[in-house]
Amino acid sequence: MQQYSGNSYAHKESGMTSQIVLKYPEQPCSPEDMQDLSCPNLFLNREINWLDFNAKVLDEALSPQQPLLEQLKFLAIFYNNLDEFFMVRVANILRQYRNGAANGSADRITPAKQLAEIRRRTLLLTSRAQSHWLKSLAPQLLERGVRIVRYTDLSEKQRRFLDGYFRNEIYPVLTPQAIDPGHPFPTISTTCLNFIIQLRNRDRETRFVRLKCPNNLSRFIFIPRNKEAKTYASLGFDPNVRGDDILLLEDLMAQYLELLFPGHTVVSSALFRITRNTDLEIEEDEADDLLEAVRDLVEQRRFGDVVRLEIAHKASRELVDFLARRLRLQPFQIYRIKGPMGFSEFMTLYNVDRPQLKTPGIQGHISRLFQEGDMFGHLRKRDVVLFHPYDSFKAVLDFIRRSSEDPNVLAIKQTLYRAGNDSPIVRALIEARRRGKQVVAVVELKARFDEERNITWAEELEKEGVNVVYGFIGLKVHAKLCLVVRREAGHITRYVHIGTGNYNASTAKIYTDMGLITSNEDICSDVTDLFNVMTGYADRDLYRKLLVSPQAMRGPLMEMIRREIELHKRYGNGEIIFKCNQLVDAGIIRALYRASMAGVRVRLQVRGICCLRPGLPGISENITVTSIVGRFLEHSRIYWFHANGDDIMYIGSADLMPRNLDHRIEVLAPILDPELRRKIREDILEVHLADNVQTWQLQADATYTRLKPASKETAVNAQERMIAQHITRDDI
């Protein structure tokens, strides 16, 4: 078997490709392990492979082809991804490490080795990110008028004004917290910015103080350059920015630390932030009230174990050691940071009014079908497939809005996972209830990091008389479903929308997702039955058309792979195409290996984590794995089987991970219309698989290679081609 290569992370530009070279450990395998495809070398580690994905995001931030504010956006996304990775995944591995648990995943890499490799790669990635910001991006933004400056760069007039501003507006809000036997070490919130300060009093005694940067003040202070101090009307966000200097709040605070401690000398100080474990679990079986249990969970996150300490790279050894002792950290959990800390907050600056520094936005295709005319009559005749953001998400909003206003609609049932801050879907559901319709909302309270928002929506919907269900005990409801029940010509007709992404108008502009709207009787009956399972005590293991986890998805998917193998043995034309976000499940991976070993052509486009190792002679040589990272987050899930020409296609909410297949309520819906299947395969799948601009290909040695068109080859940027196709698209 081939060996993994590469001893470090490096970004290479050579000829036709960029390459991510990543060291990956090999482990010995027995003949039995190879026979039943359980050899750990056949599986890539999910945590290490996730870092590969975030490296691709960073590559976009470093690309000179990206406009400057797009580089800033990708850099902020890279850091936000990394924060969540430490909060959840690294926290979980750290818990395994401390408990002496073995790695239960197929790659069998121990928690200790994973933590060491995560640290090594994180240091390499963040070093590149920090260097790019300090040496390239920040100076270029400064030249183009987005002036993020240090306090020492300000004019004397600006400093005089800021002196009054600090004393009048910031100083009263600050709360220094002494740390001594009478003042215990304070609870520090995850990812908030703080100063740790070492003081010396008149008796030359040393004291330590923590000072939090107030999170209810803007971190970005916009200071006009060319006005008299008395005309400085506002220091809040200024989208116009052209005449402003932008100073970070922590930089201003650092200039006035002595003011906070009269009678003391500031010996040293450093900015720091911690990351806590937020992957806490609810004992749902013991909870009397799920909403209150989730509310308590959000509160408990304040006290999760500290996973990571980030501290300014010039911090003294005394300050680092003091925090390490108080937070009970080991050296591998400490990261020294050059440049701004908490860079994900810099996404705010993407909103400045500098369109020439951004990629032009797109106007998704808006179908008249959902705005005017006989929408329901059309949907009775044919199914509709939407591909966002190229098809505007307004079509989905209009479908639900018109249903809420239609006097013949009797009921609307809706799942909500991440609805966003200002949800037109929620408003439509409330309007439907006010018009006397039966409205049901299954609100998943356990959607990570959206719990508080979902609690707010659930309470608001309940207050308006909507029947609200708080998810499902023991399972997350991740399915994307809307059911409309309508009286037509004396009988009941149903319509459903089944999506791959959230009912969120904001993320629908930047995620690629698909949606099916149909009146197919079997599909509508399945969705009706599933809502009864989620809202009542109905129990169902099999459905007419839908694949529904946890009972009825893994088995049918495995059976379709086995059937493709059998058909290939008979006809020699077997092919499988999967496009999804994550491929982690060992059972699915082994089934795909067996398909490849039988000669079936397997093409996988996996945007994020992929634990399958392609291109291994005799095992996965018929499998290719690619990943697109571009201006939109690839989020669609499409599963296609050739089936000897009688092809089968499903779209839906489920990725190929144990959590999706076994621990969530997910739905995959068949595309029953042959013409729609053809269009999705030819116009979406094949175009994305042909991309040679934004695509990375996973190699057998666990490296990712960025594809580039050959000298005479046509460049294919799938996302840009989708934009062009939808601009000229005829209405549905």
PLM features: residue spans?
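N-terminal localization/anchoring segments of enzymes in phospholipid and broader phosphate metabolism
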Residues: Q2-I576, R594, A598, G608-I732
